């Protein structure tokens, strides 16, 4: 089975109820050659699901707690995301790792909880600029893969997103050879355990570079940040993926 193509939009801490009007345009203009996912802030998740009304657009969370319930003020359980209509959840994003001190073990525990709740876990990995400059990119990502993917992961319930930290929201992107090298390493590292897992690239993906990025071997889609907030910016990326 070939990996599924996925265009995933991460709205981060952006958007409000009025912004849900963008979803109408995304639903109306989306291509059928790939899956399309939007991960809004938690307060918009259920309103977004309700607005779609059972359409083909997928909706996901941006994080979940490793516990199923309990005294964890401000946190969200994976089962609560699923109950609200989510199909996916982003885990281990570099902003969570940096801002909240999340470790690989934390990410693995959250992914296990996501799988238990029936969610697809999008597990993020990526190197900092210092690690890239030091020539340790592949070692860093190999360690993140080993530590962040739980033993219950399968190609069906897991997606891997490679996001070089220094490229997120900066307008900078690695060159094609750098992206290809990392994606080939990830594919090889997971060939025995997750042979058909989808591998996404993230980091300043936009309409202008999407076609070129999707032509790279082992790139099955994208995790898109700012360019997913407006349908006019996101739909060309979706179209490029569907055509790849």
Q: What do the PLM-derived regions correspond to, one by one?
A:
Residues 1-244:
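Active-site loop-to-helix "anion-binding N-cap" substructures in soluble metabolic enzymes
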